[in-house]
Amino acid sequence: MDGDGDPESVGQPEEASPEEQPEEASAEEERPEDQQEEEAAAAAAYLDELPEPLLLRVLAALPAAELVQACRLVCLRWKELVDGAPLWLLKCQQEGLVPEGGVEEERDHWQQFYFLSKRRRNLLRNPCGEEDLEGWCDVEHGGDGWRVEELPGDSGVEFTHDESVKKYFASSFEWCRKAQVIDLQAEGYWEELLDTTQPAIVVKDWYSGRSDAGCLYELTVKLLSEHENVLAEFSSGQVAVPQDSDGGGWMEISHTFTDYGPGVRFVRFEHGGQDSVYWKGWFGARVTNSSVWVEP
């Protein structure tokens, strides 16, 4: 017989005894495992021989967590590549975090820039009232209390700075306040980063009055330690918005915390407002699109 395989077994699977089948399966299971080890060793040897620019491109295609948790443990060469700037600059470029051809000298720590950029988002929940007062704490309902209204509202204007913003919080004839406390570690920012690098923490808020009534507005932001001691603070003080000021237009207030020292674990954001004419209803300061960002 000139066919492939053993002529006694080809085309006759029914003649194989039950005792022989487990042995054949066991042998088949052992061979792939050995083969996998050989293939892995061959692949590692091949990668180790790659020129550095090519190896960097191979590594840059892997998830960041695998690079830090696994690849840097493979060998000294890989550890140096994972800890170095060129790999993370390449990942930043590939994922659109920096323009192609970015200059390496622009930053000292591209790995840190990468992880901060991937985490970058508004850390405040429900900043525009889409979920009523959900996510806000220490809510003070002075006068008739807070109310969520649709833009532009009575005697107000549209919020042209961000088309996605559709609502705002309106305050009343006595002070209305609300706050949020952000746990930075729970949001993915680790102790060493906060204590050593101290990335910039940027706070922004938008407020407005009505064209038919004056109002007061205030913003206070505190950086707190693990035991809620105040390590840094910003306060706008009471800002008076006179009647007919900018036709009820929206104004931005912002502050950037830098070099705030080690130990910061929480950010407490609090703002509030009231009207200055003491009219029943919701003639006080309006707030929306509040934000807290940790910048790369």
UniProtKB/Swiss-Prot annotation:
InterPro entries: F-box-assoc_dom, F-box-like_dom_sf, F-box_dom, F-box_only, Galactose-bd-like_sf. The keyword Nucleotidyltransferase does not apply. Residues 113-296 form the FBA domain. Pathway: Protein modification; protein ubiquitination. Residues 16-40 have a biased composition (Acidic residues). The keyword Cytoplasm applies. A carbohydrate binds at residues 210-212, 278-279. It comes from Homo sapiens. This is F-box only protein 2. One of its GO terms (molecular function) is amyloid-beta binding. Pfam families: F-box-like (PF12937), FBA (PF04300). Residues 44-91 form the F-box domain. Keywords: Cytoplasm, Endoplasmic reticulum, Lectin, Membrane, Microsome, Ubl conjugation pathway. Substrate recognition component of a SCF (SKP1-CUL1-F-box protein) E3 ubiquitin-protein ligase complex that mediates the ubiquitination and subsequent proteasomal degradation of target proteins. Involved in the endoplasmic reticulum-associated degradation pathway (ERAD) for misfolded lumenal proteins by recognizing and binding sugar chains on unfolded glycoproteins that are retrotranslocated into the cytosol and promoting their ubiquitination and subsequent degradation. Prevents formation of cytosolic aggregates of unfolded glycoproteins that have been retrotranslocated into the cytosol. It is a peripheral membrane protein. Residues 1-41 are annotated as: Disordered. It is found in: Cytoplasm; Microsome membrane.
